[in-house]
Amino acid sequence: MGGTFDPIHHGHLVVASEVASRFCLDEVIFVPTGRPPHKKEVSDPWHRYLMAVIATASNQRFSVSKIDIERTGPTFTVDTLRELREQLQSSDLFFITGTDALARIFSWKDADTLWSLAHFVAVSRPGHEVVDIPNDRISFLEVPAMAISSSNCRERVRSGLPIWYLVPEGVVQYIAKHGLYRSLYG
C-alpha cells in the first residue's frame, strides 16, 4: 500500500485491513513515499516511516517498507513495484491506492508498465468519483466511508485541534513529541 502517510490515519488502516480480507492477502506492506514528485510539501520521510511502523505494529499482517525512503531523488511507483517484484518473485503483488490517485495514473512515470507489475485495487474515498479505466488489472472496492484525510489531520494540529480517534494513539504521541505539523510544514 503506497502513500505519503503524512500522517498515517485510521482510514489507511481500515482500507488495508479490508483489502487484505477481501483479497485473501497474507501481508499488506505499507510503503511510505520518499520524495513524491507530485507533492511539494511533505514531512521528513523518516518521520512518516516511523509513524507507519507505530500505527501498524499491532497487526501481524501489516509491515512497513523503507524501500522508497532509502531511494535518493524522486520516488516513482513503477520503480517501487519493480523492486518489490524482484524481492518477492513468486508473490502476486497488489497495489492499493485511492480512486483519487488512480485518476492521475496515466500521468505517472511508465504508466503502461504498471499494469504488468501488480494488480491494482482502487479504493473509493468520500468526495472522489470513481474513474472509468478499462483494465482487467484493476479491482474497485468501496470501503466503509471514513472521511479522514492526512491533510485534515495536519490542519487540525496546526490549528490546535485534537486528532485523537483520527490517528492511532501512538502516532498522536509521536506527532506531539516531534512537534510535527505545528507550522505550515514541520
Curated annotation (Swiss-Prot):
Pathway: Cofactor biosynthesis; NAD(+) biosynthesis; deamido-NAD(+) from nicotinate D-ribonucleotide: step 1/1. It catalyses: nicotinate beta-D-ribonucleotide + ATP + H(+) = deamido-NAD(+) + diphosphate. One of its GO terms (biological process) is NAD biosynthetic process. Keywords: ATP-binding, NAD, Nucleotide-binding, Nucleotidyltransferase, Pyridine nucleotide biosynthesis, Transferase. Pfam families: CTP_transf_like. The keyword Transferase applies. InterPro entries: Cyt_trans-like, NadD/NMNAT, Rossmann-like_a/b/a_fold. Its EC number is 2.7.7.18. SUPFAM superfamilies: Nucleotidylyl transferase (SSF52374). Coiled coil: none annotated. It is an enzyme of class 2 (transferase). Catalyzes the reversible adenylation of nicotinate mononucleotide (NaMN) to nicotinic acid adenine dinucleotide (NaAD). HAMAP family: NaMN_adenylyltr (MF_00244). Belongs to the NadD family. NCBIfam families: cyt_tran_rel, nicotinate (nicotinamide) nucleotide adenylyltransferase, PRK00071.1-3. This is Probable nicotinate-nucleotide adenylyltransferase. It comes from Tropheryma whipplei (strain TW08/27). The gene is nadD.
